[in-house]
Amino acid sequence: MSLTFSDGPLSGRPPERVNYRIEGPAHKLLMHDFPRRVRATFGGQTVLDTTRAVLLHETGLPPQLYVPVDDIRADLIRPTDHHTYCPFKGTASYWTVTAGDQVAENAIWAYPEPNAESHWLQGYAGFYWDAMDEWYDEDERLEGRLRDPYHRVDVRRSSRHVRVLLRDSDTVLAETDRPLLLSETGLPNRFYLPAADVRQDLLEPSGTHTVCQYKGTASYWSVTTNGRKLTDAVWSYPRPEGDSAAVSGYLSFRHDDLTVEVGSPPA
């Protein structure tokens, strides 16, 4: 489970079926070492290169990478007058990154004098992920953010009967007895259906793409039928990553005007 979401031990509603108690404030922080080399580039320059990064887990938030200030290219950054305050960490100072003719305003922050309860943040800085051009985990370029080591994606073959219908209609968009079931930490199960079991004649590429750091880049389709157009109602991962690799070529459905019927497992 993720530490800070769903029923994780550092979430706002930790699990009840446990034999322990977690003492401490309602908003909890946990920092631990990140085990691999991390780099960030901007404007053709390597702004950050470190093997000493840490991950900060914070109640209700995704993990945030922090890196030693000494591992950031000092010649590419300058302090600004911008400051923010966090009641759990203290007052943050900010830096702008300049590389060639590219500028990322207030892209880096740090807590020069963190609160006593988070004193271990001193000497570390965080980056706004999208402010940099590229991020690398060892030599692999990252799609989306750095992965949460406590987040899982599992894909399993299933023989459940799955049918996708246009709501308030008998129009069937897809039907299969051979779906894949994708379970992801903190999210509801999703069924992915073979493309051969989907009414391709009702689908039109929408041009929308989204990036998930756990599954890869998704492509979307809109459904047009019975005079109705359901935008971005179908998606697929053409080149899924890691534990999601099995869903390549499969499609999933979600839209307020669609009903996904799932039958009981066969006896």
Segments from the language model and where they lie:
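Terminal leader/tail segments of proteins
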Residues: 1-267
